[in-house]
């Protein structure tokens, strides 16, 4: 069970969206090895810690602290720790995705969001995160794709068909990313996408 804990924690936090968007920006620029995976995963982890800090603080205050002090039982601590994570997931989940998993679980239509079991919320949250990450990735890809198309068109019109367009477009894509302060914009968009 403990070996599944890291995977479970990754799936119910902001990590999924962040790592997918960071991976897509790396591919959009055209340098699949830069930044290296360790840097990308480290950045994704620290951004996840940043985004999830209010949830972790609430868990510390309402569940972990009282449990270690002996004021509440383990079952109460679990219940109180689950509540902020559920709230975080429910703020991000799409209604359509939640309805899909309520239907697939063959549950009666819940009257309130609190009636939806956590085992239904988690997969709905995951596919909502995937959809959001791919939407953000698409928006990031478009300007870089335009640069590739323009460079390809110019090279074709000059009769330079043997020269790979990526070789010419890469410096322009890096220049664009640096000129618009891409890391700043990307981090800002990622963090604000969770509010």
Language-model segments: which ranges?
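Hydrophobic alpha-helical segments and their helix-loop boundaries in membrane
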Residues: 1-195
